[in-house]
């Protein structure tokens, strides 16, 4: 019997792309609009909920200061000590927890853990989980 490949949801793909775009934006210091446009035109967007990708990326950038202020008290190190991927994943998940009430908090946290497993260092998903587990109740999401 052939092993079936698990189909990745369009929203998960949107989150993957948003984390990659946030990472690119953070390390390149290029304009967010340019990053978004080049991402959509140059990356494989097959199977991606593109409107959701755009919403996640644009709004995380727009609300960045508020998102970072929300994250800061729950870190055990400075924001500068986070890897760019950890920062991108935390920012995206915190944006969803804070500004997307239709996304259940467990989904936002689980998606962030999966993103950290995919893109982050070996144990970064554990750190991401710990931080988000503190942020969610502080935002009234648990």
Curated annotation (Swiss-Prot):
Its name, as the record gives it, is: Transcription antitermination protein NusB
Pfam families the UniProt entry points to: NusB
Query: Which gene name does the record give?
Result: nusB
Q: Which residues form a coiled coil?
A: none
Show the taxonomic lineage: Bacteria, Pseudomonadati, Pseudomonadota, Gammaproteobacteria, Pasteurellales
Instruction: Provide one Gene Ontology biological process annotation.
Output: DNA-templated transcription termination
Record CDD domains: Terminator_NusB
Gene3D superfamilies noted in UniProt: NusB-like
Give the record's GO CC terms: cytosol
Family assignment? Belongs to the NusB family.
Organism annotation: Actinobacillus succinogenes (strain ATCC 55618 / DSM 22257 / CCUG 43843 / 130Z)
């Amino acid at each position: 019997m052939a092993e079936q490949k698990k189909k990745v949801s369009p929203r998960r793909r949107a989150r993957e792309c948003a984390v990659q775009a946030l990472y690119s934006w953070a390390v390149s210091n290029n304009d967010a609009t340019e990053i978004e446009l080049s991402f959509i035109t140059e990356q494989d967007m097959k199977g991606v909920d593109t409107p959701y990708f755009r919403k996640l990326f644009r709004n995380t950038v727009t609300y960045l200061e508020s998102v970072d202020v929300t994250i800061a008290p729950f870190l055990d190190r400075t924001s500068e000590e986070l890897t760019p991927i950890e920062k991108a994943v935390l920012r995206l998940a915190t944006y969803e927890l804070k500004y997307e009430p239709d996304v259940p908090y467990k989904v936002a946290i689980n998606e962030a853990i999966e993103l950290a497993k995919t893109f982050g260092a070996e144990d970064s998903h554990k750190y991401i989980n710990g931080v988000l587990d503190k942020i969610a109740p502080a935002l009234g999401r648990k």
